[in-house]
A protein has these predicted regions:
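Histidine-centered divalent-metal-coordination microenvironment in nucleic-acid enzymes
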Residues: 86, 114-139, 169-173, 177
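DNA replication initiation on ssDNA origins
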Residues: 1-83, 90-101, 168, 176-179
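Structural alpha-beta junctions
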Residues: 16, 51-59, 105-115, 151-158
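Short, well-ordered loop/turn elements at secondary-structure boundaries
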Residues: 57-58, 79-81, 112-115, 122-124, ...
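Catalytic micro-motifs at enzyme active sites that drive phosphoryl/nucleotidyl and oxygen chemistry
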Residues: 70-76, 105-123, 157-161
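Basic/polar, cationic surfaces and motifs that engage anionic cell-wall
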Residues: 160-187
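Helical (often loop-to-helix) elements that flank the catalytic cores of nucleotide-handling enzymes
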Residues: 94-110, 132-158, 180-187
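Long, low-complexity interaction regions most often at the N-terminus
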Residues: 2, 31-33, 112-113, 142-145
Length: 187
């Protein structure tokens, strides 16, 4: 009976919570949740277990993939690196998301770059996210080198040079992109 209840609970977990649980699996640092609205930009900081209790089905909700020592989203307070990521602004290319994904699957993933753990449709583009074994901020120079390699490799697909920082916030699956009025989804 307990197993059946646990399985039912798993089914009811939102896409957002499942994503957070995977990305921040054993995170000990602070995670930033941000909301961008007509009133401006607001951010809050939570530990992993606090964050999963929140709602994410609203417009323009983002989180950090890496964590911080303090409740400040600044590079000097970076605690753990959990993931590498590339933000593909596909709307700035001559290709559809589907064409880009087909090209990446056929010619890049598993060849020039590893296959990402997550591909997320952010509304106007795609996020490619690679989970890494949690490492301290001392690994930042290596992390940056890999990010820059991914950027150079994926530049023709709309890779955003402005989105290569370890403190970056990305839209969370289950939230709504207000520019396109579409749900951010894991593909």
């Amino acid at each position: 009976m307990v197993l059946a209840l646990k399985q039912e609970d798993e089914k009811e977990l939102s896409q957002s919570v499942k994503y957070i649980n995977i990305v921040h699996r054993n995170s000990e640092g602070w995670i930033t949740k941000a909301k961008i609205s007509a009133e401006g930009y607001k951010q809050w900081h939570y530990k992993h277990m606090q964050l999963v209790k929140l709602k994410f089905d609203k417009d323009n909700v983002c989180i950090t993939l890496n964590t911080f020592y303090k409740t400040y989203r600044r590079i000097e307070y970076l605690r753990e690196l959990n993931a590498l990521f590339i933000d593909l602004d596909t709307y700035k290319t001559d290709f559809t998301k589907e064409q880009i994904l087909m090209n990446l699957n056929e010619n890049y993933f598993g060849k020039n770059i590893p296959t990402p753990n997550f591909i997320i449709d952010s509304g106007r583009g795609l996020y490619l996210i690679w989970l890494i074994k949690k490492v301290p901020s001392m690994a930042l120079p290596l992390w940056k080198a890999v990010e820059e390699y991914f950027y150079r490799t994926l530049k023709e697909f709309g890779a955003d040079i402005q989105a290569l920082d370890a403190t970056r916030i990305l839209r969370i699956p289950g939230s709504i992109n207000s520019k396109t009025h579409t749900e951010v989804k894991i593909i």
